[in-house]
Amino acid sequence: FNSFPTNICFKKGMIKMAGNTLENMDKSSFSPMMQKYLETKEKYKDCILFYRLGDFYEMFFDDAITASRELEITLTGKDCGQAERAPMAGIPHHAAEVYAAKLIEKGYKVAICEQLEDPKTAKGIVERGVIRILTPGTIVESNLLEEKKNNYIMCICKTGLYFGISVCDISTGEFYSSEIKGENNFETLLDEIARFSPSEIIANSMMFECQEEMDKIRERFSIYMSRFSDKFFSDEVGNLQLDYNILENKKEIGNLKERTLVVKSINALLEYLNETQMTSLEHINTINIYNLSKYMALDINARRNLEITEKMRDKSKKGTLLWVLDQTSTSMGGRLLRRWLNDPLLDVKEINERLDAVSELKDNMMLRGDVVDTLKKVYDIERLSAKMTYGNANARDMITLRNSLEKLPEVKNILSTCMSPKLKQLYEDLDELQDVYELINKSIIDDPPMTIKDGGIIKLGYNAEIDKLKTATTEGKNWIVKLEAEEKEKTGIKNLKVGYNKVFGYYIEVSKSFVSQVPDRFIRKQTLTTGERYITEELKNLEGQILGAEEKVVNLEYEEFVKIREQIAKNVKRLQKTANVVSTLDVLSAFAQVAEDMNYCKPVVTDNGKIKIKDGRHPVIEKMVGIGNFVPNDTYLDKDGDRLAIITGPNMAGKSTYMRQVALITLMAQVGCFVPATEAEIGVVDKIFTRVGASDDLSMGQSTFMVEMMEVATILKEATENSLVILDEIGRGTSTYDGLSIAWAVAEYIADKEKCGAKTLFATHYHELIELADKQEGIKNYSIAVKEKGEDIIFLRKIVEGGTDESYGIHVARLAGVPKVVTKRANEILTSLERKSMLSGKKQENKKVVEGQFDMFNYKLGEIAHEIDKINLNELTPIDALNTLLKIKEKMK
């Protein structure tokens, strides 16, 4: 912070300094405690340091100023050995997670500095050290994470034109890596960022030095980004085996040696996680090296326009494809569903295996019901197992894990009756983890406390020494009860009672009215407003025995709990594999339930290049309006036949909805889900492109039309004959003739098998384009049916063969509530324009575009024709005729 915030109110005598001033000061002039703080802060300059002092985390100097502003907490001061106090702000230690989350959300990193020794036994200043750094991509606390969404951190290694990427969710242990080489590398990188939607990105210096690329990432995504030292981007494969124990066999090592960029990104990301987490990363035990060609390519625009997992406007889930399909019963299943929707498959065999499993679950209502009922009682095994390896799982987490593992035999039994290959494989892969279940069940009590350092966790019968000490404690407390009865009898004080608190220990309490009866052997310990508290030698001896045993029990229980947690952590790979089985079954079951509820059909998925849909519906809109209220439509596209469908019709008639519907049905089929149609045959699509609408990108200095043309250019470069392209009203951002020319040329290019040949839905308001169907093979005209009733129109929402040259724009304006006087005037203007258009020959049927002759789009013809029409031949002299002809010739130049 180079300048001091104006909204911070300083108290008199407080140091007014920014970081650069502090650096210039002599550190030895500060108090011993503050010197220790400054030593720690020096190592974590890029973080806000939460410095533990007793029951609070304190922040000093610039950190305090920032925290006071961002967290809206009081800025105060602390004596620091200087003439003036250091700015200070503090938060209660038990609320640290909440405050840290707020700072992270605002783009800060937070370093947690804990007391590493008991202040009671410390000699001198308490030893403190940073135990963890919190960043947006390294959060593991369940209450700070979305249950059904991964929290990814991405590492990018740029070398020349190529990229190596690694992505990890440390809350689950998932780790993915890939290499981006070939054409359009940066666009592919953007697509991968959109696919994973990380909350944090780290990258090497070469990436940060490319300002144009960094600006594009920042403008398209709201992601925390930071540069990580190049020295950690090592290409040593051995590190992964020796330091992290991730690679298990020589084949994996050999495969990685050929992928230098991948190895560099993996090493850097693991090092970053080590630096920030400072704990075991054993739950990250497998690196999934994925090939981009395994999945359907969906660029940023396609993901946004199709609203697959989030709404375009408010980023919410409701109103998306995910919202329609998410009937998962577990958090793990919800996260896997999101990943599947982001990664539609290309392998026909794998797709059909999923579809067959969904079909079996859909057709067997009892089977599906058993799956749902059982999985509803299974918690987040994936994140729970990660917490075990992290060492931050408490006893309640263990019981939650135990309760989940208890249901695995039921899941295994359900799967044993299944016949489809996918479900059979899940049966084979499911590890019931009975040994882990038994370990927790016999060691941890059923309803343990939240804290793990106060005892009351370990079951009787698990540890003999703990049992012995607990017995001694119980007997001691029985002696206390006996002592109370004896003292009442000896003293005659009937309301005498023996009590205990953590500050004063055990005591005998006597009310004021009986203080005169207290014997001399009672030693006063504490005076109350209502009476006195005493201690006796006998009670003191009992207290020593009881508290000594209790302290030993608490310490032993904690030690035993840690051992149990470590034992569970050793099984993390088994737990993760089982979590994957459960989540896969959960998603397949959700697909089956949606298919049953919404009357979806099983698509026939092939590689024949056809998209044939009968009575297709838009899945999201159908759910919103209700079954039976959505008008279905057919679709036929064939890479060897009708590749490009030109769709004309009025605005608001449903063109955009129809095109998105086809794209979503195709995507759903390749995810392995049933689709909203009565029949569907889907030839696998390698990429889906969408050019739907446009909005000015003023931050990049690009107009609507420029953005549109850039998107079209990308489509023309990257689309193949196996792609699906959605083009909605291209060419609107420029003049009519420019727009029509571009739309015409784009349609010609895409329809040409030699140049592109992608299956395309092309909605347009340029009715001239319907002529293309007669001029070029592979193009067919469609339109949205409209019923006219007097001055009104009814949108039938039905796609029919054949083009239309009616736009019904004024009718739409009337429906939208435009004042009648305006629509009436618009009709008058339209009539006038149509008359002029007829004179200029614009509506002649079967117009030909012949190279070398007049351009069909030359607007001068209309003006000249109108001039000729005004000439009165009866009054025109030969000289006038020649002059008029010269003017016309001049205009034709």
Stretch-by-stretch model annotation:
Residues 13-360, 369, 373-389, 393-485, ...:
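Charged catalytic and DNA/RNA-contacting regions of genome-maintenance
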Residues 61-62, 259, 329-330, 334, ...:
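ATPase nucleotide-binding head domains, primarily ABC-like/P-loop NTPase cores
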Residues 113, 136-145, 280, 419-422, ...:
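Active-site phosphate-binding and catalytic loops of NTP-dependent enzymes
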Residues 193, 198-206, 538-571, 675-677, ...:
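Conserved catalytic alpha/beta cores of large enzymes that bind or transform nucleotide phosphates
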Residues 233-241, 296-297, 312, 403-478, ...:
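Amphipathic heptad-repeat alpha-helical coiled-coil/stalk segments that mediate oligomerization
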Residues 351-354, 374, 378, 472, ...:
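Intracellular alpha-helical coupling/juxtamembrane segments of multi-pass membrane proteins
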Residues 394-397, 873-893:
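Short, amphipathic C-terminal "tail helix"
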